[in-house]
């Protein structure tokens, strides 16, 4: 059953405040005999089922539905949002985060405690974002990319079950992931499902971030 964006945001905030980490079990999806012979919609359907089963014990609902996925698969990509969610921007976000910490890290400023979600804006528009989990940078990837990445035994963690999965990116693995992302992004053609096509619109993403920031 599909739930509202507000419900997902509230559950996400509650989950972050208690410091929980939710693992998404994709073994059934990856090892499925039908996986190599199905189209994107079928893979996403199996992926949604895996997410729902993994999140059922944490009272975190996913608002992804087969209907919305079908619509997104046919949608045009949002280049700006696609850039925000690509591996190619991860190193830039990392350096930006260091600048942000130097400028605002004040342990005595109780009114401005750091949020697990860091957002950078230019003239009011989101130009980048980054999530931290247990002091590890969380790299956002496309769901289909996550299926391919799982062969490297990287463990997915919760970011936003409506849209994406995410993986913690240890420093030693970052160059490998960055190279993979650059290669996969370059090989995507206009008929393929991209991160942005499976993700929210720019307006939805702005609203989602705004609600999270209001709670910190």
UniProtKB/Swiss-Prot annotation:
Residues 182-193 have a biased composition (Polar residues). Residues 182-204 are annotated as: Disordered. It comes from the Eukaryota. This is Uncharacterized protein ZK945.6. It comes from Caenorhabditis elegans.
